[in-house]
A protein has these predicted regions:
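Catalytic cores of nucleotide-sugar-dependent glycosyltransferases that transfer UDP/GDP/TDP-activated
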Residues: 1-304
């Protein structure tokens, strides 16, 4: 992704999506090239894919920018560099699959006679990108897919969205039936993920909470830490899937408290794969994944 190299954790769920997608396609004997920022690493299950890395100026996450902000269209932008590299490889390929939420790869669909397929990773976070999705989708409706209906609803001009959910390599997760560990929260530590609500709940019921994920906003994390006694929050950092599932599987429950329209909610499925029940806000993808009272519990959004 343009905000961080693969294996850094900065790309959030997109990194897991890419790993699962590439691994699945390789198992079906497809030839795969992956273009990513320099220092990227692929997971072991994707090792037979060809990895091409490029350098360029990174950008901030769209959810942390003003809705009316303009795209960085400089020649040195990492998005443009990745797109340029991908286009140089097309003579041996059938299609480009774009996982970035950015203007250039989407607009390029109108400019070249080669299929560029877009798996949109976020809801409507940018007017400029929403407008280009609308324009390109009207010409190439089958070139776009979304993770959930809740996410696709952010784009009302798309009347019949293609919903693909997400894929998971379940062999990477160990199902643990009995556990009496602490509560868990997993995700990028940033305001839109709503960690403060999960910590509040844990504190109110006298429980400790393990927090896994890259700290994207240091001030936000520090403010949450300041509000609660030392030891109530156990910061675990970002871990690869094999290490995450070991610790997550020992927890009693995962609390999922997104403040935005979560496109899917990979961590919800990851917790389920470990045998950990999930309590989540009924918002975005988690509201579709969880069957209330059967595979987890849903509560009114923001009702901590």
């Amino acid at each position: 992704t343009p905000i961080g190299f693969l294996s850094s954790g900065r790309g959030g769920g997109v990194e897991l999506t890419l790993s699962s997608l590439v691994s699945g396609l390789l198992k079906q004997n497809h030839f795969i090239n992956v273009v990513a920022p320099i220092n990227s690493r692929l997971s072991e299950s994707c090792s037979s894919a060809n990895l091409f890395t490029v350098e360029g100026s990174q950008q901030n996450s769209w959810q942390h920018q003003d809705y009316y902000s303009k795209t960085n269209n400089s020649d040195d932008s990492i998005v443009n560099k990745m797109l340029e590299k991908a286009l140089s490889l097309i003579k041996d390929c059938d299609a480009i699959i774009n996982l970035s939420y950015d203007l250039e790869p989407i607009s390029k669909t109108l400019e070249i006679d080669f299929p560029i397929l877009h798996l949109i990773s976020m809801g409507d976070e940018s007017l400029e990108i929403s407008n280009i999705i609308s324009k390109v989708h009207s010409n190439f409706p089958h070139n776009f897919a979304f993770h959930s209906r809740a996410q696709a609803s952010d784009y009302p001009f798309i009347k019949d969205p293609i919903i693909v959910g997400n894929g998971f390599e379940l062999s990477k997760y160990t199902y643990q039936e009995k556990k009496d560990g602490p509560l868990a929260w997993v995700g990028r530590v940033a305001p839109e993920k709503g960690l403060e609500d999960a910590v509040y709940v844990a504190s109110e019921i006298g429980e400790k909470i393990n927090v896994w994920g890259i700290i994207e906003d240091e001030n936000y994390a520090s403010e949450i830490s300041r509000l609660y006694p030392a030891g109530e929050i156990c910061w675990k950092g970002f871990l690869p899937t094999n290490k995450l599932q070991e610790g997550l599987g020992q927890c009693r429950a995962l609390i999922n408290t997104p403040k935005w329209n979560e496109a899917y909610g990979n961590v919800v499925v990851e917790a389920m794969a470990c045998g950990v029940p999930v309590v989540a806000y009924k918002r975005g993808g988690p509201g579709e994944i969880i069957q209330h009272g059967e595979t987890g519990f849903l509560v009114k959004a923001d009702d901590k």
